[in-house]
A protein has these predicted regions:
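Short beta-strand/loop motif that positions the catalytic acidic residue
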Residues: 147-149
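Serine-hydrolase catalytic machinery in alpha/beta-hydrolase-like enzymes
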Residues: 10-19, 29-95
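Primarily recognizes the serine-hydrolase "nucleophile elbow" in alpha/beta-hydrolase
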Residues: 87-142
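Conserved alpha/beta-hydrolase "acid-adjacent" motif
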Residues: 154-161
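Short, proline-enriched alpha-helix->beta-strand connector loops that line the catalytic pocket
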Residues: 139-145, 168-169
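C-terminal catalytic histidine-bearing segment of alpha/beta-hydrolase fold enzymes
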Residues: 170-252
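Proline/glycine-enriched tight loop/beta-turn segments at coil->beta junctions
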Residues: 21-29, 140-142
Length: 252
């Protein structure tokens, strides 16, 4: 998958570190976090892009050590998420020791980015979900963070309410005429999901710490409804945002 682009790789905790043949900045790490399906095509494409430009890349897998395979966000018995791990446990990753860490997260990986934003030099969150709000998260300084919203994404619409209540909200880029998953090469499908209403109440930190990919837990805190979500790759926008992030990395 990456053999032609890397000189070696390392595994640190739950992060696969990929080192290109010629490193342009040995102080900088591009750290990439996956969404509900685990590491896949979006993470591979982003990794290949930055490796080809000489950047060391780390791919986070925050599922495997918690025995999470894939999240369905469903209340149907055969697809209902019922994992014991909490989001905080899953998102508690050991950041590799680089002077500059640029995080790029997709969907739930974008949520990981919001929760951990203070740990990064730059933080780019593509169509992040909002799994719950606390006053601590609302008070956090997101001046290093950019959220990329897909214009036609109805799954992650709660993020807008979250951002409106932040004291120092992230910068916002809007991907025109795009849907959830527009960074996933070849993706074109619709999926039924449960959408939890996560921005009506501000939770205590203790309450937030109990949240996880478990329908019974989430419905005890949040009302929910049913939606059919469209996921659609947009090659033009995908390439444009890769290049925008690259340009900002080159100035660090």
């Amino acid at each position: 998958m990456f053999n032609d682009l890397i000189s070696k790789f390392e595994i640190r905790d739950s992060i696969l570190i990929l080192i290109p043949h010629e490193v342009v900045d040995d102080e900088l790490l591009i750290l990439i976090s996956h969404g509900s399906g685990g590491p896949g095509e979006a993470e591979t494409a982003m990794s290949n892009f930055f490796l080809s430009h000489g950047y060391t890349v780390g791919i986070v897998d925050y599922f495997t050590k918690h025995n999470v395979k894939k999240l369905f966000w469903s209340d149907r018995p055969e697809y209902k998420d019922a994992y014991e791990a909490t989001f905080n446990e899953m998102f508690d990753i050991a950041i590799p020791n680089y002077k500059k860490v640029v995080h790029i997260g997709f969907s739930l990986g974008g949520t990981l980015g919001l929760v951990n934003s203070t740990k990064f030099t730059k933080n780019y969150c593509f169509y992040p979900g909002t799994v719950g709000m606390t006053q601590e998260l609302l008070d956090q300084d997101y001046s290093n963070t950019t959220v990329i919203i897909a214009q036609n994404d109805i799954w992650c619409s709660d993020y807008r309410e979250f951002a409106s209540q932040c004291k120092s909200p992230p910068r916002k880029w809007v991907a025109k005429d795009c849907y959830h998953g527009f960074m996933i090469p070849g993706k074109e499908k619709t999926i039924p999901i449960v959408k939890y209403v996560t921005t009506e109440n501000v939770l205590s930190w203790g309450q937030f710490n109990t949240l996880g990919p478990n329908h019974e837990v989430l419905k005890s805190y949040f009302d929910y409804t049913w939606l059919t979500i469209k996921l659609l790759y947009n090659e033009k926008e995908c390439i444009m945002y890769m290049n925008k992030i690259l340009k900002e990395c080159q100035s660090l």
